[in-house]
């Protein structure tokens, strides 16, 4: 998959064609790392590199076929586990979320799949992002998992709430307060960027750039880098985000280390726009 992925990133192959290649061939991939990379790339292709006009259709297809791959995989295999995790990351249609809910409730089972604490959080976060669960379910899950990992997973799930209020609370918890460790900042960013309706992130284009210099000057490098990388509203991946990023770079010649981080984020958006243009053909 690697060479085809490079061509997809370069805007030479349509994202939907890369997705089809992976879905048609990934079942026979027997090397765990290669499988993990292929599934991560499949997710990026469907969520970011696809043309917006047919993105929802592609995502629905990807999720449905990942569920089928999960059901068909050898019970207890690494493939089965990775297919299920990726399915949970992209599930958005009602029928797909029904499977997630049933697995979490125990009303549906897959031979070989054990719902441990980590997988339980991933399934719950999928339901939260899909509007099927909320703060009560997150609080209950955290009460049952009083570990550092549980706290991180709860922060990610809360930040994935698909409402303007949820995104604002996630933003405020780490940008306006300076009390959380790097691990919580990082997982909050993961949940914040998870948005089936990417327009939830639109208000943060301006807020992000307004706050950059301040967090760079006031936080440790590790925290600042986690904020800058984790809360850049990259799921928007459109001309408005690109132009705002270019404008900030034009207006801020210093400091070089901060500019370097932002320039790398700009490169990602520009790459996504090229890929989207190709996928629209």
Predicted segments — roles?
Residues 1-281:
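Long, ordered, helix-rich scaffold segments
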């Amino acid at each position: 998959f690697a060479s085809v992925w490079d061509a997809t990133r370069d805007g030479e192959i349509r994202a939907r064609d890369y997705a089809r290649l992976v879905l048609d061939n990934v079942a026979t991939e027997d090397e765990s790392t290669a499988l993990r990379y292929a599934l991560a790339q499949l997710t990026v292709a469907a969520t970011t590199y696809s043309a917006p006009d047919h993105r929802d259709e592609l995502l629905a297809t990807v999720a449905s076929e990942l569920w089928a791959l999960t059901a068909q995989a050898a019970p207890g295999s690494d493939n089965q586990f990775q297919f299920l995790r990726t399915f949970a990351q992209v599930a958005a249609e009602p029928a797909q979320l029904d499977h997630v809910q049933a697995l979490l409730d125990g009303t549906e089972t897959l031979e070989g799949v054990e719902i441990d604490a980590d997988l339980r959080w991933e399934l719950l976060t999928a339901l939260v992002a899909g509007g099927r669960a909320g703060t009560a379910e997150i609080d209950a899950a955290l009460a049952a998992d009083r570990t550092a990992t549980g706290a991180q997973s709860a922060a990610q799930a809360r930040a994935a709430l698909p409402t303007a209020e949820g995104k604002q609370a996630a933003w405020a918890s780490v940008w306006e307060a300076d009390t959380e460790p790097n691990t919580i900042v990082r997982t909050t960013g993961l949940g914040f960027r998870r948005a089936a309706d990417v327009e939830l992130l639109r208000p943060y284009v301006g807020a992000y750039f307004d706050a950059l210099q301040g967090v760079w000057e006031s936080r440790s490098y590790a925290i600042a880098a986690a904020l800058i990388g984790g809360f850049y509203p990259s799921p928007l991946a459109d001309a408005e985000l690109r132009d705002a990023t270019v404008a900030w770079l034009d207006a801020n010649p210093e400091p070089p280390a901060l500019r370097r981080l932002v320039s790398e984020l700009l490169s990602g958006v520009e790459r996504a726009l090229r890929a989207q243009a190709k996928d629209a053909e």
